[in-house]
Amino acid sequence: MSHADLARTIEAAWEDRASVGPTTQGTVREAVEAALALLDSGQARVAEKSGSADWQVNQWLKKAVLLSFRLNDMSVIPGGPGGAAWWDKVPSKFEGWDADRFRAAGFRAVPGAVVRRGSYIAPGAVLMPSFVNLGAYVGEGTMVDTWATIGSCAQVGKNCHISGGAGIAGVLEPLQANPVIIEDNCFIGARAEVAEGVIVGEGSVLSMGVYIGASTKIIDRATGEVMYGRVPPYSVVVSGTQPGKPLPDGTPGPSLYCAVIVKRVDAGTRAKTGINELLRD
């Protein structure tokens, strides 16, 4: 089936999803499995650039992921330490892989890396003990460091560094919600968190512990501009606070968290400058 045919079949199945279950066979199951295979191989993505700055979300692929949970029954997944097993609906991406398959895929996955089937890892990527959920996309040359999480349907570009313990949040529901997107050449600091469909523009640096969701104020220190949901390309971002409103009795109110763009750099500066130097005021 073409992508258009798959999309039509999955959209129709989604409208009648109450009737979809582990016993469902035929075109619905075939379409969902084909969609997951496209995601797993990188031939299709939940979100892709449609222009110089805009991202298009392929909602039918998110629906395929959700339908797969209805289609697939729970099963034992072997391979745990000490002969332990897991109990889940989604097998490992690496189930049945041998050395030739890993060499062909072209990325590194160290012991402790958990990658679910239906996610794509591009050649040259390095996965430390981390978690990559289904529907996610990890670009060429990207490092996913220890205990970092790439959530369901999250999109991470080329040559990024997702530092230890950082969270790139996933999104399956609500259905209309957009995935988190980390564009090419970004650095996400340790224990930082990007959630709720936020887009981090190309070449940006998020310092350790920066949290950005859809309602987080992102303030450009140089201009005073306040923005939401998108970090402009080549921004250097740190955690900050903004004065709160006075309390009813007139005393100062609590300060509120925000993310602060402390500087913007061009591509050449970003390529030549070390991360610590960029973050230094």
Curated annotation (Swiss-Prot):
Q: Which reaction does it catalyse?
A: (S)-2,3,4,5-tetrahydrodipicolinate + succinyl-CoA + H2O = (S)-2-succinylamino-6-oxoheptanedioate + CoA
Query: What are the recorded GO MF terms, alphabetically?
Result: 2,3,4,5-tetrahydropyridine-2,6-dicarboxylate N-succinyltransferase activity; nucleotidyltransferase activity
Q: Which GO terms describe its cellular component?
A: cytoplasm
> What are the protein's UniProt keywords?
Acyltransferase, Amino-acid biosynthesis, Cytoplasm, Diaminopimelate biosynthesis, Lysine biosynthesis, Repeat, Transferase
Q: Does the keyword Acyltransferase apply?
A: yes
Give the family from UniProt. Answer: Belongs to the transferase hexapeptide repeat family.
Q: Its GO biological process terms? A: diaminopimelate biosynthetic process; lysine biosynthetic process via diaminopimelate
What's this protein's name? Answer: 2,3,4,5-tetrahydropyridine-2,6-dicarboxylate N-succinyltransferase
EC code(s) of this entry = 2.3.1.117
Q: Localized where?
A: Cytoplasm
Q: In which pathway does it act?
A: Amino-acid biosynthesis; L-lysine biosynthesis via DAP pathway; LL-2,6-diaminopimelate from (S)-tetrahydrodipicolinate (succinylase route): step 1/3
Task: Please report the organism this UniProt entry assigns to the protein.
Answer: Methylobacterium nodulans (strain LMG 21967 / CNCM I-2342 / ORS 2060)
Q: Which Pfam families match?
A: Hexapep_2, THDPS_N_2
Main subcellular localisation: cytoplasm
Alphabetized PANTHER family for the sequence: 2,3,4,5-TETRAHYDROPYRIDINE-2,6-DICARBOXYLATE N-SUCCINYLTRANSFERASE, MOLYBDENUM COFACTOR GUANYLYLTRANSFERASE
Per UniProt, subunit arrangement is: Homotrimer.
